[in-house]
Amino acid sequence: LDDWRGRLAVEIATARADAPLTTDRLDALVEPSALALFDQLDLPVYGSGFIAALDSLADANSHLAWWQGPERAQLVLAAQSVNKEHIDYSELEWYRVPFQTGRPHVAGPYVDYLCSDEYTITVAAPVHVDDEFVGAVALDLLIDQVERHLTPQLAAFGDDISIVNGVGRVLLSTSPTRETGDTIRGDDLVGFERRPCPGMALDVLIAR
């Protein structure tokens, strides 16, 4: 996401210099890179797009420029089709943490009632234009697909390996005693080697 957010920051700055940024203009900027991301990662990406900063667009208080699913169709929320002013994601982790910290964040696992209605993790990275937070690029991964894809690969390296997010919540594990959503922190970390995942707010915990 780092390369994309850098490019998008430049594109948004250029677009705003010409005219006020609207939802349609933002969608046109985001769509090519959002769709390309589905094929760029060695992971089963379910959704990809950009979450606009609140009150940053000329014609809406909030907006998700988002594509998802097997058809990679654009997401249209009920609130977007009736009244865009009613979408308030200010307290949702995948928006709130990048906004407050200025750093990428992995949210979840959680049930994504807004987009997929599935057990999901969201990777989000903030986008800034001249130090102004204008939104976050993000992607969704469905937990069941990630487990099928990565667990066999992890199992080849050991029977007690876990991938955890920044607060120690398990995304997936090869251990039969740990499930997605469990936490490993504090005294539970004794006996584990921690290896950070470059470019992502994730750690791999390997039992010594």
Q: What are these language model-derived features?
A:
Residues 1-22, 119-120:
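Juxtamembrane extracytoplasmic/periplasmic/luminal helical "stalk" adjacent to the first N-terminal
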Residues 2, 23-38, 147-151:
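Short amphipathic alpha-helical segments
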Residues 33, 90-115, 143-154:
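Short, basic/aromatic recognition patches
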Residues 42-101, 172-174:
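Extracellular/periplasmic ligand-sensing ectodomains of membrane signal-transduction proteins
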Residues 116-150, 204-207:
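Conserved beta-strands of PAS-like sensory domains
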Residues 141-169:
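Solvent-exposed, extracytoplasmic
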Residues 176-208:
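Extracellular/periplasmic juxtamembrane segments that couple receptor/chemosensory ectodomains to their
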